[in-house]
Regions:
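PLP-dependent enzyme catalytic core of the Aspartate aminotransferase-like
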Residues: 1-6, 69, 73-77, 81, ...
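N-terminal "arm"/small-domain region of PLP-dependent enzymes with the aminotransferase-like
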Residues: 2-6, 15-84, 213
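Conserved N-terminal alpha-helix of the aminotransferase class I/II PLP-enzyme fold
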Residues: 73, 77-121
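Conserved PLP-anchoring active-site segment centered on the Schiff-base-forming lysine
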Residues: 128-147
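Active-site phosphate-binding strand-loop segment of PLP-dependent enzymes
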Residues: 161-217
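Active-site PLP attachment segment
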Residues: 229, 235-270
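Structural motif of enzymes handling amino- and sulfur-group chemistry
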Residues: 283-302, 312-314, 321
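Conserved PLP-binding catalytic core of the aspartate aminotransferase-like
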Residues: 302, 307-316, 321-355, 366, ...
């Protein structure tokens, strides 16, 4: 029975949520940049819900495969054979033969014993980091690790220790302060999703060997982009054998949805039977699985896609530098255009959109307040001419708002 003497919890929740005002403030200024509906595929030129067409420089489809006819055909064939859903967990009735086929291909691709797929990339990190964060152990996180890694660490039993971005001196100091025989897991992004730089994996591996730690690389933004055949950061450095766990997602270069973790057989077996976001979630849909599998084939068969991606990437990086932009230390198709002011960044996004360029703002807490930026992302399907058009328009906007001179 409802007790009238107790506070109205719904009202309290509403009051707490009402204290969040940033979105309303931005809407009042008419510079709200989120939830813009698109009514076409993620191609270089997309059609918005209002019928307008804009150049897309905000997508993670690095190889331009998300609208590829071959992936669509694979997805359609899978739906016809398996239906639209597996209607259950991988642990129970939700394992298909195409799941296992994809996992075998992924393990070979990244050079590991085995792989297991999850229904989203977020669930991979949530389930793996929490599961391997043993009681009495330690998890070491880079300050710019993705939110799902941070959330996974919060669900673990381990003590979490953060270190400044790519600061190996601080990481070593923190490792030195932990018991040598305690479980230690270092988790880093391979390619950092907001600023585009690459983790110093050689030094991390060296520290792992010195302090008896393991390393997990979230290669969501590295797979398809760097390494042999696009096999990622560990391959890029020639450190596949010394990288304990490699995580990847299918929503970027693979043009699908889902994720995976690959590693030694005993670790993957443990995760299969203990990772909660795997066991208690429905499995990847047949369509997503088939599309990811076909994308992996194309990734290997068509290196020219990656070569062109790097051609437009190098061109864009040089063009922005020559125009006076601060693009940080990017080493990838993710180019940060630092603005360092939240409202100004959102104003830039609106002005660019009105001129036919779709870009995205990155604000706190995704980055520190003084590192607010515009994320400019390239695809293998972009042309040099499209890049030049976007750079020209953004240069004029940044100068008008006095971000660059």
């Amino acid at each position: 029975m409802y007790d009238k003497t107790k506070p109205d919890m719904k009202k309290i929740l509403n009051e707490i949520c009402a204290k969040y005002t940033l979105a309303d403030e931005v809407k009042q200024r008419d510079i709200y940049p989120y939830y813009r509906p698109i009514s076409s595929g993620q191609d270089p030129l997309v059609t918005m819900a209002d019928g307008s067409k804009v150049l897309m420089f905000g997508s993670n489809s690095y190889l331009g495969l998300s609208d590829d006819p071959r992936l669509k055909e694979a997805a359609e064939a899978a739906i016809r054979k398996y239906g639209t859903s597996c209607s259950g967990s991988r642990f129970l009735n939700g394992t298909l033969d195409i799941h296992e086929e994809l996992e075998a291909k992924l393990a070979k691709f990244v050079g590991k014993d085995e792989a297991i797929t999850y229904s989203t990339g977020f669930q991979v990190n949530l389930g793996v980091v929490s599961c391997l964060g043993f009681r009495g152990g330690f998890i070491f996180l880079d300050a710019l690790d993705h939110a799902c890694i941070i959330d996974g660490s919060r669900l673990s039993f381990s003590e979490v220790r953060k270190f400044p971005h790519n600061d190996m001196t601080v990481l070593e100091r923190k490792l030195r302060m932990t018991p040598r025989n305690a479980p230690k897991l270092i988790v880093v992004d391979g390619v950092y999703s907001m600023e585009g730089d690459i983790a110093p994996l050689p030094k991390i591996v060296e520290l792992c060997e010195k302090y008896n730690a393991s390393v997990m690389v979230d290669d969501a933004h590295g797979l398809g982009v760097i390494g042999e055949n696009g096999s990622g950061t560990a391959s890029h450095y020639g450190l596949t054998d010394k990288t304990d766990l490699i995580m990847g997602t299918f929503s970027k270069s693979f043009g699908s949805l889902g994720g995976f973790i690959a590693g030694d057989r005993e670790v993957i077996n443990y995760l299969k039977h203990n990772s909660r976001s795997l066991i208690f979630s429905a499995s990847m849909t047949p369509a997503a699985t088939a599309a990811a599998s076909r994308a992996l084939d194309i990734m290997i068969e068509e290196p020219e896609r990656r070569e062109h991606l790097w051609e437009v990437t190098r061109h864009a990086q040089k063009a922005f530098k020559d125009a006076g932009f601060d693009i940080g230390h990017t080493q990838s198709p993710i180019i940060p255009l630092f603005v360092r002011d939240t409202f100004k960044a959102m104003t830039i996004v609106k002005m660019a959109y009105e001129q036919g360029v779709f870009i995205t703002p990155v604000i706190a807490p995704a980055v520190p307040e003084n590192d607010v930026l515009i994320r400019f992302a390239l695809m293998a399907t972009h042309s040099i001419e499209q890049v030049d058009e976007a750079v020209e328009k953004l240069t004029a906007i940044f100068k008008k708002l006095e971000v660059i001179s």
